[in-house]
C-alpha cells in the first residue's frame, strides 16, 4: 500500500506517482461495467456501425462508386491472381482456386435463416471473432492475397463484394459456369456485436443438433462454419453426422439437394491441410503479436507453408483434378471402398483402400496419393436420403452442375435481401423464391389519389389504435440482417403472417382496407396499409394539439401467395415484439433483451426505440388490446404521458407473480392500482441509459420534440424495405 512517504519520494525524483506501476492506464482498461454486471442490458447494440467508425463518411455512395468500376477488368485481375503463386503462401498446384472458394464459402456460410444474422453481406470475415475462428485458419492469407487488387480498385469494390466475387472467379477459372453475381454488399468498419455465436467459452465445444433448433446458431461446434468434418464430437462415424449436417445447412435455409450439391461442389476443388501436428500452429490473428500485422496461425512445422502447411489438421484431396471442375467427387465416393485413417496431424479421415494412387501432389509432380475423404463427405454415401441425391448427381453431372450453381448463388446472396438490391452486369434475370420476389409496380398514386385514400381511411370507422396496429404489423417484420420482411408486398394479408398470434388483432382491419383498395381500383394494399398508419399517427397528433404531416412514399406492390415461401416466412414470426407488448415464449432471454433484439433488427437507435415504444403505448397498440404500459387516460392521443407517468414517483411498482413479467403500479398513498406494465415498459425507468432518454421525453418542454421524434422513427420503420428510395 502506498504511503505519504512513497509519494513524497517519487515527487522528489521528479516522477509522477500516478505514472508508476503495472496497472492498465489506457482508455477502456480496467474492470468494466460488464465485468461487474454481466447481465447488463445491451443497449449499446443499437449504436453499432455509426458514421463515427466509417472512414468514408456519411456522403459516400457505394452504389454510385460501383457504377464506375471496370468490372470485367477486375475479374481479369482476379483470374490472373489465381495462378500468381506467392512464396510467403505458395498456391496448391499453382492455383489459389480452392482457397478463394473456401474464403467465399466461409464468409457466406455464417448466415442463419432463423434470425437473418451472419452471412457475407458486410465483410465481417475481416473482424473478430470470424477472422480468428478455428474453421477460418489460413483465410487471413486469402484476404492478404486480395489486398493488391482491393488497393488498385479502392472504394469501387467493397471487401464484402470482393470476397464473394473472388470465389466466383475461382470457380469460373476452374471450368465451372456460375449462376451469376450480384454486387451491393457494403462494408462496415467494426465487428457485428449483435450476432449470438453461442454461450460456449471454449472453441470447438460440441452442440447437439437438436439444440440448434432452439437457438439462432448455425454450426454444431463453436468456431465452425457448419459441422465437424471428423463427425460429431470427433466420432469418426459418417452416418452419425447426417443429423448435424441437416440441422446446420437447414439453418442456412438449404434443403437436402442443396446441401449435397454444396458439400460436393465445395470439395471438388482444392484440398485440406494437415502436414503435421496442429501443436505447431501459433496464435490466431487476434492473438498474434503486433509484428505479424494481422496475420495469424504462423507454423513452426518445416517451412510452415506449401507442402508443410497446417490448417484444419486434415490432409484430404478429393479429386484427381483439384484445379479443374469435374464429377470426380461422386465418382470416387461410390467407386471405392473407404477405410478410416488419420492425417499426419492425427485427425480422423478416410482413404480409398482399393484405389490406385491417382491424386497429384500439390507441390511435387513426381508424387501421387490415393483419394481421401472427410468423415462428413462419406455421409453423402451412407445416409439413405443423401445417397439418393448423390447417386443422381453421379449419373447426371449436368444436374449436379445446375444444382451447385444455384445453391452456390443462394449461399452467397442469401443475406442480401430482394433482387432489387443487386447491382452489376451479371445479376441473373430469374426471380428466385428465396429472394421474396415482388411484382413490378403498375401504378404509382398521385397526390390527389393519396388525399382521397386518406379521407377514405379516416372515414372507415377504424380507430387510431387499429390504424397504427395494422401498419406496424405489416412493416415490423423487417430484419436488418438479411433485409427480409417489411411492408412492401403486403404479406400481412397472406399466409403465414395473417395467422400469426401477434397479428390477431391487427388483421381485423384488413377487410376494411381491402375494401378501400378495391374501391380505389389502383392503389396497392401495401401502400394503403402504410397510409393507414399515416392517418392514425396524424389523427393522434392532432388530438394532442399538434398539426403534423407524416411523410408517405407510395410505390409499394402486393405480393402473391405463390411468391411467398411459407416455411421461410414462418421464421419471421416474432417470439417477442416489445413494441406491441407481445411475448410468445418465456424460455428464451428476458423481455427487455428481446426488445433490444427487435429494435436492432429494425436498425433503430436507442432514442428511436424509446420514442416508438412510448408512442405505441399511448396509441393503444398492444397486440391484444391490453392496458399494460398504457400510462395515459387519453388513449389515441400522441402524448408523452407514457414517460411522464412512468417516471412519476407517486407510483410504486410490484410484480404480480413470481415470473416478474407483469407489474402493478400502485399509488404510494392510497394503494390503488393505477397502471399495469410489462418488463418492456418498466425497462425505460429501470435501465440507466434508457431512463436518461425517457427523462428527455418526460420533460415539460418535450412534447413537440417527442411527437417529431416518434414520427421520424415511425416513417423509418415503414420505409425499411423501400430499397427503391435509396
Swiss-Prot record:
One function term, GO molecular function aspect: heme binding
Keywords: Heme, Hydrogen peroxide, Iron, Metal-binding, Oxidoreductase, Peroxidase
Positions of disulphide bridges: none
Catalytic reaction list: H2O2 + AH2 = A + 2 H2O; 2 H2O2 = O2 + 2 H2O
EC number: 1.11.1.21
GO CC annotations on file: cytosol
Catalytic residue positions: 106
Gene3D superfamilies, A to Z: 1.10.520.10, Peroxidase, domain 2
GO biological process, one term: cellular response to hydrogen peroxide
Site (Transition state stabilizer): 102
Binding site for heme b: 267
Oxidoreductase keyword on record: yes
Cofactor(s) named in the record: heme b
Note describing how the cofactor binds: Binds 1 heme b (iron(II)-protoporphyrin IX) group per dimer.
Covalent link Tryptophyl-tyrosyl-methioninium (Trp-Tyr) (with M-252), residues: 105-226
Enzyme class: oxidoreductase
Subunit and partners: Homodimer or homotetramer.
Similarity annotation: Belongs to the peroxidase family. Peroxidase/catalase subfamily.
HAMAP family: Catal_peroxid
Protein name in UniProt: Catalase-peroxidase
Organism: Escherichia coli O1:K1 / APEC
Amino acid at each position: 500500500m502506498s504511503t505519504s512517504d512513497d509519494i513524497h519520494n517519487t515527487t522528489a525524483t521528479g516522477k509522477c506517482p500516478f505514472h508508476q506501476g503495472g496497472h492498465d492506464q489506457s482508455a477502456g482498461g480496467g474492470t468494466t461495467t460488464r465485468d461487474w454486471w454481466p447481465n447488463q442490458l445491451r443497449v449499446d447494440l443499437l449504436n453499432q456501425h455509426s458514421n463515427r467508425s466509417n472512414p468514408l463518411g456519411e456522403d459516400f455512395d457505394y452504389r454510385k462508386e460501383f457504377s464506375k468500376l471496370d468490372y470485367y477488368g477486375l475479374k481479369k485481375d482476379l483470374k490472373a491472381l489465381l495462378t500468381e503463386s506467392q512464396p510467403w503462401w505458395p498456391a496448391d498446384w499453382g492455383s489459389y482456386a480452392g482457397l478463394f472458394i473456401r474464403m467465399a464459402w466461409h464468409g457466406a456460410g455464417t448466415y442463419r435463416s432463423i434470425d437473418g444474422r451472419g452471412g457475407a453481406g458486410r465483410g465481417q470475415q475481416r473482424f473478430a471473432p470470424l477472422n480468428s475462428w478455428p474453421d477460418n485458419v489460413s483465410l487471413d492469407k486469402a484476404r492478404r492475397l486480395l489486398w493488391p487488387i482491393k488497393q488498385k480498385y479502392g472504394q469501387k469494390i467493397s471487401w464484402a463484394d470482393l470476397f464473394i466475387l473472388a470465389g466466383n472467379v475461382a470457380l469460373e477459372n476452374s471450368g465451372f459456369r456460375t449462376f451469376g453475381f450480384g454486387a451491393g454488399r457494403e462494408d462496415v468498419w467494426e465487428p457485428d456485436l449483435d450476432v449470438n455465436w453461442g454461450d460456449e467459452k471454449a472453441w470447438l465445444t460440441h452442440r447437439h443438433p437438436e439444440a440448434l433448433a432452439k437457438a439462432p446458431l448455425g454450426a454444431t461446434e463453436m468456431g465452425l462454419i457448419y459441422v465437424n468434418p471428423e463427425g460429431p464430437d470427433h466420432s469418426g462415424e459418417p452416418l452419425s453426422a447426417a443429423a448435424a449436417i441437416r440441422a446446420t445447412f437447414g439453418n442456412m435455409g438449404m434443403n437436402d439437394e442443396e446441401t449435397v450439391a454444396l458439400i460436393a461442389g465445395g470439395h471438388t476443388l482444392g484440398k485440406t491441410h494437415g502436414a503435421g501436428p496442429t501443436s505447431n500452429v501459433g496464435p490466431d490473428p487476434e492473438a498474434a503479436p503486433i509484428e505479424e500485422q494481422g496475420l495469424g496461425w504462423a507454423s513452426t512445422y518445416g517451412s510452415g507453408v506449401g507442402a508443410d502447411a497446417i490448417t484444419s489438421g486434415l490432409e484430404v484431396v478429393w479429386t484427381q483434378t483439384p484445379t479443374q471442375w469435374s464429377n470426380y467427387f461422386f465418382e470416387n465416393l461410390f467407386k471405392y471402398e473407404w477405410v478410416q485413417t488419420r492425417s499426419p496431424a492425427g485427425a480422423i479421415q478416410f482413404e480409398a483402400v482399393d484405389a490406385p494412387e491417382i491424386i497429384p501432389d500439390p507441390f511435387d509432380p513426381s508424387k501421387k496419393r490415393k483419394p481421401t475423404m472427410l468423415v462428413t463427405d462419406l455421409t453423402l454415401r451412407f445416409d439413405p436420403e443423401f445417397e439418393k441425391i448423390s447417386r443422381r448427381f453421379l449419373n447426371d453431372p449436368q444436374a449436379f452442375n445446375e444444382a451447385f450453381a444455384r445453391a452456390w448463388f443462394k449461399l452467397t446472396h442469401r443475406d442480401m435481401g430482394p433482387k432489387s438490391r443487386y447491382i452489376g452486369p451479371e445479376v441473373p434475370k430469374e426471380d428466385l423464391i428465396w429472394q421474396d420476389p415482388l411484382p413490378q409496380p403498375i401504378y404509382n398514386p398521385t397526390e390527389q389519389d393519396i388525399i382521397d385514400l386518406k379521407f377514405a381511411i379516416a372515414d372507415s370507422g377504424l380507430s387510431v389504435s387499429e390504424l397504427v396496429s395494422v401498419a406496424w404489423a405489416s412493416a415490423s417484420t423487417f430484419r436488418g440482417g438479411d433485409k427480409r420482411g417489411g411492408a412492401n408486398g403486403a404479406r400481412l394479408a397472406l399466409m403465414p403472417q395473417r395467422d400469426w398470434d401477434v397479428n390477431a388483432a391487427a388483421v381485423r382491419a384488413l377487410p376494411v382496407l381491402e375494401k378501400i383498395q378495391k374501391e380505389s381500383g389502383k392503389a396497392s394494399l401495401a401502400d394503403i396499409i402504410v397510409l393507414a398508419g399515416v392517418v392514425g399517427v396524424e389523427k393522434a397528433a392532432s388530438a394532442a394539439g399538434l398539426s403534423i404531416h407524416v411523410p408517405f412514399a407510395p410505390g409499394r406492390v402486393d405480393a402473391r401467395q405463390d411468391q411467398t415461401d411459407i416455411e421461410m416466412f414462418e421464421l419471421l414470426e416474432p417470439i417477442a415484439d416489445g413494441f406491441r407488448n407481445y411475448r410468445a415464449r418465456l424460455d428464451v432471454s428476458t423481455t427487455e433483451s428481446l426488445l433490444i433484439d427487435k429494435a436492432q433488427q429494425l436498425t433503430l437507435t436507442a432514442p428511436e426505440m424509446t420514442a416508438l415504444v412510448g408512442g405505441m403505448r399511448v396509441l393503444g397498440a398492444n397486440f391484444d388490446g391490453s392496458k399494460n404500459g398504457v400510462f395515459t387516460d387519453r388513449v389515441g392521443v400522441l402524448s408523452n404521458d407514457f414517460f411522464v407517468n412512468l417516471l412519476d414517483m407517486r407510483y410504486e411498482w410490484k410484480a404480480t407473480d413470481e415470473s416478474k413479467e407483469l407489474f402493478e403500479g400502485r399509488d404510494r398513498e392510497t394503494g390503488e392500482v393505477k397502471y399495469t406494465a410489462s418488463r418492456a415498459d418498466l425497462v425505460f425507468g429501470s435501465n440507466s441509459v434508457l431512463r436518461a432518454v425517457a427523462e428527455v421525453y418526460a420533460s415539460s418542454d418535450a412534447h413537440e420534440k417527442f411527437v417529431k421524434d416518434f414520427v421520424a422513427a415511425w416513417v423509418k420503420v415503414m420505409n425499411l424495405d423501400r430499397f427503391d428510395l435509396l
